[in-house]
Curated annotation (Swiss-Prot):
Belongs to the bacterial ribosomal protein bL12 family. The keyword Ribosomal protein applies. It comes from Deinococcus radiodurans (strain ATCC 13939 / DSM 20539 / JCM 16871 / CCUG 27074 / LMG 4051 / NBRC 15346 / NCIMB 9279 / VKM B-1422 / R1). The keyword Ribosomal protein applies. InterPro entries: Ribosomal_bL12 (IPR000206), Ribosomal_bL12_C (IPR013823), Ribosomal_bL12_C/ClpS-like (IPR014719), Ribosomal_bL12_oligo (IPR008932), Ribosomal_bL12_oligo_N_sf (IPR036235). This is Large ribosomal subunit protein bL12. Pfam families: Ribosomal_L12, Ribosomal_L12_N. Homodimer. Part of the ribosomal stalk of the 50S ribosomal subunit. Forms a multimeric L10(L12)X complex, where L10 forms an elongated spine to which 2 to 4 L12 dimers bind in a sequential fashion. Binds GTP-bound translation factors. Keywords: Ribonucleoprotein, Ribosomal protein. GO terms for molecular function: mRNA binding; structural constituent of ribosome.
Length: 122
């Protein structure tokens, strides 16, 4: 039995919502199917890492390195801290910024690493 796919699509497009509902019910009865969503157990593990991709990062100073003056300048520029606070941060390390967008966090990391610091994004 040959059919014209486009003609069938056009005919279905002309049906009202009630007519479509009746058609679906009739097809369910004829073919013995239900509208339950099929769940695949095997693919869930592979999809998890993509779904959990982080969008916000904390910029963490690990070590100021040898050129502390340049690192202190970058810390001040990034955080807006005063000279003393930025110096203390460069000596003890810690979180410089929390909840930063990925591209902005990577930019901050690059600036600090160019100044000689060791930085992590968490």
């Amino acid at each position: 039995m040959a059919y014209d796919k486009q003609a069938l699509i056009d005919q279905l497009g002309q049906l009202t919502i009630m007519e479509l509902a009746d058609l679906i019910d009739g097809l369910k009865e004829t073919w013995g199917v239900t509208a339950a969503v099929a769940v695949s157990g095997g693919g869930a593990g592979a999809a998890s890492p993509a779904a959990e991709e982080k969008t916000e990062f904390d910029v963490v100073l690990i070590d100021a390195g040898a050129s502390k003056i340049n690192v202190i300048k970058e810390i001040r520029g990034i955080t807006g801290l005063g000279l003393k606070e930025a110096k203390d941060m460069s000596e003890k390390g810690g979180v410089l910024k929390e909840g930063v967008a990925k591209d902005e966090a990577e930019k901050m990391k690059a600036q600090l690493e160019a100044a000689g610091a060791r930085v992590e994004l968490k």
